[in-house]
C-alpha cells in the first residue's frame, strides 16, 4: 500500500489532536491564565475542559455520520444548507487558523527572546513574530515531507518534557500555593479565564477535518476526540499544579511571556529553564507548521471555493497560490495589532461561534445522527453563556479587543455577502464522503 493511501490509526489521530492542543496554549498563554485566574488556574483548565467535552458530544455524533475533511462546515452545511451564514462561517473557520498563527507567533517570541538573552521590546518582539511566520511560510512554499508521520514523535517529545515538569514539580510542591481561592473576585477571574482558555482544547476539531483519512471513522473519530481532550486536560491540570505550586503567583504573572520556563527554575534549575524553553519553541513551531500546512490549507479552500475534492490530501498545497501568503500575512497582522490576551480572546470567540453553530446543527440533525436533545440544549446554553462572558470581560477590561472581536465577525459577514454576489460561488456536496 502506498503511504499516501495509508489511513491514520486511532492513536495517530489522537496524537495529531493532542499536538495541536498542547502547542496552542499550555506554553503560549499560560501566563495570561495566571494573571486572570490566579491560583485557581488548575480549576480553570478543568472548567474549560468541561466546555470542550460538551462541544465534543456534538462533534462525535456528527463526525461519526458525516465524514468530511471540511469538518464543522460540512456539519453546518448539512443542517442549514448553502447560504450566507454557511459561507461566512467557512471564512470564519479560515480566520480561526489565521488568528491561531498569530497566537503561535506571539508565544514563540515570548520564549525565544529570553532564551537568547535579547531585550524584550516592541521591535524585537515584532521582528521575531514576522520572522517565524515567514520561515514556515517559506518552508511550506517549498514543500514538506512526512509531516503527518513525524507528528506522533513530536507529540511524544512534548509529553515527555511536560511529564518531567509535572513529576519534578509535584515532588517539591508547596501545598499552600495550590489551595483554591474562593473569594468572589477570584472565582469570577477563574470563570473569565475559562472562557479565554476554551481555545486550549480547540485542537480536537482537527480530527473531524481529517476524518476521511482515519481508519474506521465512525468508530474512531468519537473515540479520538474524547481521548485527546481527556489526555490534554490531565496534562494541563498537572502542569498548572506544578507551576503555581512552586512559584508564587505574583512571580508567575511577572513572567507571563515565558511563564512555564520560569516556573521550572525552582525545582529543575537553569537546566529546567532551558529544557522548557526549547520544548516550548519546538512545540509552538510544530503547531504553527501544522496549522499553516494542514488546517489553513483546507480552510482556505473552503473559504474561497466552498468545496473540497472527496479525498483532499494533506500533501496538496493551496489550490490558489495566494492562499499561503494571505493566511500568513493576516496572521502577522493580528500578532502585531494585539497582545497575547487579545489574540487568545479573539481566537476563543471565533471558535465559540463555530461551536455554537455545530451544536445547533446537531440539534437540527439529531434524528439522523443520534444523541440526546437535553444534552445538546444544555451544551448550547453553556457555550453561549461562556461566549457572552468573554465579550463582557473584554468590554470591561480591554475595549480594543472587544471591538476587534466584533469587527472580525462583521467583516467576515460583509465579505461573504459581497464575495458570494460577485463570484456566484456555492457550496458543493463534494465535501461529503459517500459511503
Swiss-Prot record:
GO terms for molecular function: transmembrane transporter activity. The chain crosses the membrane at residues 14-34, 44-64, 84-104, 123-143, 153-173, 187-207, 224-244, 267-287, 324-344, 346-366, 375-395, 400-420. Keywords: Cell membrane, Membrane, Transmembrane, Transmembrane helix. It comes from Methanocaldococcus jannaschii (strain ATCC 43067 / DSM 2661 / JAL-1 / JCM 10045 / NBRC 100440). It is a multi-pass membrane protein. One of its GO terms (cellular component) is plasma membrane. It is found in: Cell membrane. The keyword Cell membrane applies. InterPro entries: AA/rel_permease1 (IPR002293), APC_superfamily (IPR050367). This is Uncharacterized protein MJ0609. Pfam families: AA_permease_2.
